[in-house]
Amino acid sequence: MSYLPCELHCHSNHGEGNFSVSELLQKSADDHLALIAITDKNTTDGFAELDDSVTPSIKGMECATPYGSLLALGIDSAVDTLNTTPDNIDSVIQELRGNGAVVGISHPFDENGAWKFNLRNHRNIDFIEVWHGAFTFANVENDKALAMWTELLDKGCHIACTYGRDWKNDENSGHFGCTYLDIDGEINQHNALKALRMGKSVASTGVKFFFRVHQKGVTYTIGETLKKGSSVFSFFTDLHSREKNSGAEEVEYQTIKLITNGGVCVMETVVSERHIHINLKNNHWYRAELWGKVDGEKKLLAVTSPIYTA
């Protein structure tokens, strides 16, 4: 398998959603999603109704508090968040990870659930929802989340990016994206979580976009660590993937950017480019971004998790 479309933030009628679990699974299959995560707020009551024969799924929960929300993926039972405070969040995350969960920050700048925790060890975070909800020009929370992610990468954290629709109902008026996961082997919870934990993810408006790096006869993929020096980046772009999910806006795909520490662009090329040479610096991260125009306005349309150098 190679970079399959997934939705990692879904709600059923056991929580805030309007769908039954069976309806959610069928709608996911109809939407050609390879896998979803059920993440009802502070409950796992929907787990018993999951059916991987319809759509493979991850058992998860949105740990919702007055100070922000976490996504805990790969859990077997509900997590008690009643006593979670801004100052004990590190111990909560450590306990989740100790029980095998993959832990992410959900919509850190959402007006109804902004991140207010005093997290000390960001290295215990596996992923961050850099994009959330429908893609509109009014959705400024995504720009802030992307900047937060960049700051964490600059601190040396290896954190993957995800998109979260926060799927609750049949709202179809917006343009919704997906998270592409590089799932190796059978499509199931174990392999999907392995991909996310290893940082093999892409947040996208729909377009399929990823890269590999070739260095001294060895090929590296997103999420991996390699040495500094001369390298060749190979880009893979399918502009028509999930095209049915596009909205009424006019989208023009234009350029690929390679971004590194501090959000600095070290390379920009046309979207049709397949291979570029670049000299990687030590102790840096590098992510690829696909840019274009939406109704004439310049917009980021896909972003990969980084590779790292050491």
Model-derived regions: residue spans:
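A metal-dependent hydrolase metal-coordination microenvironment
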Residues: 1-106, 111-123, 129-151, 155, ...
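Catalytic pocket-lining loop regions of alpha/beta-barrel enzymes
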Residues: 126-127, 194
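C-terminal functional module detector
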Residues: 1-3, 23, 160, 167-310
